[in-house]
Amino acid sequence: MKAAVLYEVGKKLEIIDLNIGKPKQGEVLVNMKAAGVCASDHHVIHGQIPYPTPIVLGHENAGVVEEIGENVQGIQPGDSVIMSFVSSCGNCVYCRTGLANHCSRHYSDPEVQHKLFDNTFRIHDQEDTGIFQMNKLGGFAEKQVVPADSLLVIPNEVPPEVAALIGCCVTTGFGGIVNLDNIKTGSTVAVFGCGGVGLNILEGAKSLNANKIIAVDISDHKLEFAYKFGATHVVNCLLYTSPSPRDRTRSRMPSSA
């Protein structure tokens, strides 16, 4: 299969042929259909997030199940799936107490975080060098073996290029605000930064019936999108030095930012 591999920080991704193994217990082989390019991928490429190399990036993914390993339940070949960028082992204290997003085995070590849970590789290059998978996923590839617990089955009719974004920017943004307990009906919310995550925070604020939703960014293009995602007011901070964007939003009484 082909994949885009980062061999060295600061260098371009290399599209090369890789060998891929069979899914083991609790794992699934997925044909990747779409992968979002997240800011985190750029941070890794430029060394702003220390990840091991060589590595296949991509953690906003959608695909179709090709093969399942032993003891995989609720997933069948042919299922359309999206992926969580935080894999959970199901056995550590966090996973057992409903805090799987803090899985200690996933975050225990940078190298372990980007291998499968048995601490081995499923993909190798032609020199048999093991290739890391970003967050045990690695969507910048034609196929990947991933933990079954990272997958969520979705309706087949959902376009993969739409579904892929749910894996990070939607869950991070929308989930981040709807899981707060201080956003009530009628609240005023200010969102600083209207990238993929910020836009989904706006949508989450709208779903919580916030009264005023103020979007702050330096890009008019992003602020135009902000209106579509629920913003009632926008502020381009490059246009205001006095009062500052902070004071300008305060004048509209934000209860959360």
Segments (PLM) and residue ranges:
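Conserved small/polar residues in nucleotide/adenosyl-binding loops
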Residues: Y240-T249
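Cytochrome P450 core scaffold surrounding the K-helix E-X-X-R motif
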Residues: S40-H42
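Mid-domain Rossmann-like dinucleotide-binding core that forms the NAD(H)/NADP(H) cofactor-binding site
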Residues: S80, E142, D149-L151, P155-L239
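Extracellular beta-rich ligand/substrate-recognition surface
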Residues: L6-K12
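Cysteine-cluster motifs in flexible loop/terminal segments that predominantly coordinate metals
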Residues: S87-K143, A148
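Glycine-rich beta-strand-centered segment in the early N-terminal region that forms part
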Residues: G21-A35, I45-R96, A100-N101, D109, ...
